[in-house]
């Protein structure tokens, strides 16, 4: 049985530290020879002098080179290596719109529930009256516009996801096309809801 040292390189051609690789055939023997990428110091061949200590690990220079190269590499996956795409923004906006719509829904229903439990008997008509009489006009437009456009976008992008689930428009061109349709539909439906 002959032990050899092989230079292992990464996919990108960056040299790695030399690693002890014995030429053996069974996994059991392999376990006796390798421990964490190094020669097992307790193996019989090591103590019988068949493998020299220099075969265990290469010089410290290679290890230092490896450490310095790793420090310079970006953490993977790193956003700076990718070009921004429409799908990123629409995916993020879909999640954000869902969270904001849910928060508005929960605030509304919790308000109705808590006031009913406290004996105030608040109804939808009471909240609607408060909205129109107590809230400033600009605040009404902001609330209604936010709800209208967020709902329109979330609704349209949900349909887009259903189309993808059926296996359609999964190419880059299809993703951009459906994203553009969703944005145009958001403008139309959101403006319609805001005008109501």
Swiss-Prot record:
A ubiquinone binds at residues 91, 95. The chain crosses the membrane at residues 98-118, 138-160, 175-195. Disruption phenotype: Does not affect SDH or TIM22 complex formation. Residues 54-97, 161-174 are mitochondrial matrix. It is found in: Mitochondrion inner membrane. Keywords: Heme, Iron, Membrane, Metal-binding, Mitochondrion, Mitochondrion inner membrane, Quinone, Transit peptide, Transmembrane, Transmembrane helix. Residues 119-137, 196 are mitochondrial intermembrane. Heme binds at residue 154. GO terms for molecular function: electron transfer activity; metal ion binding; quinone binding. Coiled coil: none annotated. Residues 1-53 form a transit peptide. CDD domains: SQR_TypeC_SdhC. One of its GO terms (biological process) is tricarboxylic acid cycle. It is a multi-pass membrane protein. One of its GO terms (cellular component) is mitochondrial inner membrane. Belongs to the cytochrome b560 family. Homolog of SDH3, but seems not to be a stoichiometric subunit of either the succinate dehydrogenase (SDH) complex or the mitochondrial inner membrane translocase TIM22 complex. This is Mitochondrial inner membrane protein SHH3. It comes from Saccharomyces cerevisiae (strain ATCC 204508 / S288c) (Baker's yeast). The lineage of its organism: Eukaryota, Fungi, Dikarya, Ascomycota, Saccharomycotina.
């Amino acid at each position: 049985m002959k032990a050899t040292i092989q230079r292992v390189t990464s996919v990108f051609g960056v040299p790695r530290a030399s690693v002890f690789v014995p030429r053996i055939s069974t996994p059991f023997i392999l376990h006796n020879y390798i421990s964490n990428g190094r020669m097992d110091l307790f193996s019989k061949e090591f103590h019988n002098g068949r493998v020299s200590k220099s075969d265990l690990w290469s010089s410290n220079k290679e290890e230092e080179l490896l450490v310095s190269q790793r420090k310079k590499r970006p953490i993977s996956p790193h956003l700076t290596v990718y070009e921004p795409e429409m799908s990123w923004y629409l995916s993020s906006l879909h999640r954000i719109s869902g969270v904001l719509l849910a928060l508005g829904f929960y605030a509304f229903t919790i308000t109705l529930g808590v006031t009913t439990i406290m004996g105030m008997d608040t109804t939808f008509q009471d909240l609607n009256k408060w909205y129109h009489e107590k809230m400033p006009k600009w605040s009404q437009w902001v609330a209604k516009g936010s709800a209208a456009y967020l709902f329109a976008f979330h609704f349209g992008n949900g349909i887009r996801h259903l189309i993808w689930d059926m296996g359609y428009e999964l190419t880059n061109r299809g993703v951009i096309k459906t994203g553009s349709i969703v944005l145009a539909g958001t403008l139309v439906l959101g403006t319609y809801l805001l005008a109501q």
